């Protein structure tokens, strides 16, 4: 059988989340804290196998839905911003920006391996 590439596109109602963030523009400027409604669309390209399938796409639908659930109703903060320092204690993250400290309950925050959001 000739092998060929094909693309599967996944989009479901559970592939959404609401999350807050702030975009940091410089050492002294940032957006106010605010949130967005995100819809996730996944496109996967792979070789089609002899049975006419690429893979069991149900795994990816489930996994993306689980990731969206983890990000739902959470505040996203970048871990690697050059303008944002953070410390923590047992219950809180303390984010320091432009000489001001913003405390957040740890359960309300997801630290992202990014420089900005």
Sequence positions of predicted segments:
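Charge-rich, low-complexity N-terminal segments
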Residues: 1-117
């Amino acid at each position: 059988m000739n092998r060929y590439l094909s693309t599967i596109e996944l989009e479901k109602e559970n592939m959404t989340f609401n999350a807050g963030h702030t975009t940091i523009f410089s050492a002294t400027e940032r957006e106010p804290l605010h949130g967005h409604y995100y819809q996730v669309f996944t496109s996967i390209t792979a070789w089609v196998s002899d049975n006419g399938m690429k893979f069991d796409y149900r795994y990816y639908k489930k996994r993306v839905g689980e990731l969206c659930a983890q990000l739902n109703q959470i505040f996203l903060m970048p871990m690697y911003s050059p303008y944002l320092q953070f410390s923590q204690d047992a219950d809180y993250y303390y984010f320091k920006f432009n000489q001001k400290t913003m405390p957040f309950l740890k359960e309300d925050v997801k630290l992202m391996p990014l420089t900005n959001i």
